[in-house]
Amino acid sequence: MIGTEKVTALKAKHQSKSSTGLSWFERIGYGFGDMSYNIIFQFVNAYLLFYYTDVGGIQPAVIATLFLVVRVLDAIFDPIMGLILDKTNTRWGKARPYLLWVAFPFALFTFLCFTTPHFGETGNMVYAYVTYILLGMSFSMQTIPVNSLTGRMTNSVEERTVLTTTRMILVYIGILLSISCATPLATAIGGEDQAFGFQMTALIYAAVSIVLNLFSFFTVRERIQPKKRKKQGIKKTLSVLFKNKPLLMLISSFLAFAIGFNIKLSTMVYYFTYNVNHKEFVFMGTVLFFGAALISNLFIPFFSEKWGRKQVMIITAALSLISYAGLHFTPYSSIPLIFIWLFASGFFTTPLNTLAWGMVADCVDYAEWKTGIRADGVVISSMSFINKLGVALAGSFSAIYLGIAGYVANTDQTVASLNAIKNMNALIPGFFILLSIILIAFYPLTEKRYKHIISELEQRSAR
């Protein structure tokens, strides 16, 4: 057995590197890395469906197939990217260099996705598939390394919560500005030419993402260096996913959240355009929803330390159900009440997202403790895969539901299509949030158990 003094010294040394070693400058720099991704990712999620139907004139059924095929292919790339990340070794670390390498391709493919060529109907569809697939691959090459950095910068539960919360506050600021400014920017730049307006808006966002990525690259550091072990085969590395009950419960819950959240996000513009009949309120609705998310994230570290992260997820998500039910029964003419429900849903729903991305780093340590294999990339990529699968299912569901309901762009909508849009902003997201609550209730990794796992890992490393 290792001596008590040696374990104590090892813990003290480790704490000095993880808990006290992160300055606010570095936390903010890390947040900028994820902010750069989400400015683009959420812009695409919120507006690409609308861009294709109302600007490109593509039928919803065609878009449904495009979204499902491209996003599933994109999601399949995530585990591959995870394996690539696990085999990456540079003088800058494993994950950090991707902030530099991917910054420019990521920006380029964003611009190309919102560029409509004149290749004819078939040529334009091929172009849409190719550019969207390339954008999705660059998404993976950006987000998987960024998310794995949490576990490489610190293994303190408290520090990870602060780090993830700081990151998510910046993410929600980015999303807030990205989504709320998109329509005004596109209108100001393009006027009646929406295609040009959205293209230039995408170019502006792409340029901002490059700056944020580079800032993040130059500010973050990888401190946690796991003990070197012999290389594992791909099959054995992937096996850590299926032996990891905390991860399986976390990603199942997150899938339900991602479907519900993205159904609402991608149809909010329809809700204000056709149901409320005030397209100009898209800006205010977005500000309230993501502004509320930003505010709620300020309280997450305090309540997570007091009650535990799983309990905070369950309580806040349960409270969010009231807002979805309230929105469903609110008349379209009651604008102030609609805004109140939007604020409440943003405030109480988004902690699910924030805490889940922090907890996945714990699942990496759990896998190492249980199997002896540390596979940051593979574990993190499973979360990214689920996120993209949720986006794919949400986008396809929304497009199919609009088609079935008889939606026709740029006309007065039927009662059936108005009800479909309302359902996708209220009852349907509420159902998936309820499912997410039920699944996360079975997440077995408590803060106390996690600290015990870290203690055992430290003792193993010292032997």
Swiss-Prot record:
GO cellular component entries: plasma membrane
Membrane topology: Multi-pass membrane protein
Membrane-spanning residues: 28-48, 50-70, 99-119, 126-146, 169-189, 200-220, 246-266, 283-303, 312-332, 335-355, 389-409, 426-446
Keywords noted in UniProt: Cell membrane, Membrane, Sugar transport, Symport, Transmembrane, Transmembrane helix, Transport
Keyword Transmembrane helix: yes
Major site of localization recorded for this protein: membrane
Cross-referenced CDD domains: MFS_MelB_like
GO molecular function, one term: symporter activity
Keyword presence, Cell membrane: yes
Location within or outside the cell: Cell membrane
Pfam family for this entry, one: MFS_2
Any one GO BP annotation for this protein: sodium ion transport
Task performed by this protein: Probably involved in glucitol uptake.
Family per similarity comment: Belongs to the sodium:galactoside symporter (TC 2.A.2) family.
Name used for this protein in its record: Probable glucitol transport protein GutA
Species for this entry: Bacillus subtilis (strain 168)
